[in-house]
Amino acid sequence: MDHGEPQTVEERDMIGEARLSLPAETVPSPIPNFSSPILLAIDTCTNRSSVALRDGQVLRAESSWESDRRHTAAVSAQIRRLMDSCDIKAAQIGAVAVAIGPGSFTGVRCGLAIAKGMASARDLVVIGVAAFDIIASAQPNLNLPLLTLVEIGRERVAVQRYEWQDGRPVVAGEWRILAWRDLAASIDAPIWVCGDVPAGLMALLGQNAIVAPAPLNLRRAGYLAEIGYERWASGKVDDVLTLTPIYPPENKPQEQSRIGAQLMQ
């Protein structure tokens, strides 16, 4: 069971790097205040990473890029670069919002370890956000249900359905893992498809699948920062010791068609 402590040498290195990134300087309030109003957002769930800085009024800076295996060094460098470009000091950061999955095992653990390292070193507020919520928050309300996708490899995607309520996307049912073909076969009514839509999956989708344009498919840390700041302001924050990643359950192949049908209900 994950109790929030690093379990591997790699994770300990990640946290050590994070602590070097932001030295301990202040102890912020769990609610945004004028002494530490900046939120840092980190998403490393897949090979598309993103970081952002947001204050109480605006998104100060954002950077997204395709990552390789050197997640930790690249993320730390991007965070420093954004802070320097905005003249933001470590003492001004009061919270860290982090994408907790699903996604690749290494990627999800990387972002979470960095966020925990920073939060532990400086007693920062930490907010964990599902990758699906980041994707959904970027979509326009077209009065269509949403299918948010996160690629997890081997021609499979993690899928979460959303419905619109009071102008906001709301989770509808449990998230699942589906093979591309099973997902495509399950779509029998118009639905907005967004997130990681690989070319191979795109070729299988029929006319009922309305695929979001490329800019809306990118998981951007700016949207993660927006969700995180809203939760911070309302006191809906997480415990750095117990916050854990979301890992994909392994569905049996024979179950996938049934699960796809359930998603469309």
Describe these PLM feature segments.
Residues 82-86, 121, 139, 224-232:
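Stable alpha-helical structural segments in soluble proteins, enriched in small hydrophobic residues
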Residues 1-36:
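Intrinsic disorder/low-complexity segments
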Residues 20-22, 30-100, 218:
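N-terminal beta-alpha supersecondary unit
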Residues 169, 212-265:
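Acyltransferase
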Residues 84-92, 119-129, 144:
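Phosphate-handling active-site elements
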Residues 34, 58, 70, 125-219, ...:
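Surface "functional belts" at beta-alpha junctions
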Residues 97-126:
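DPxDG-like acidic metal-binding loop motif
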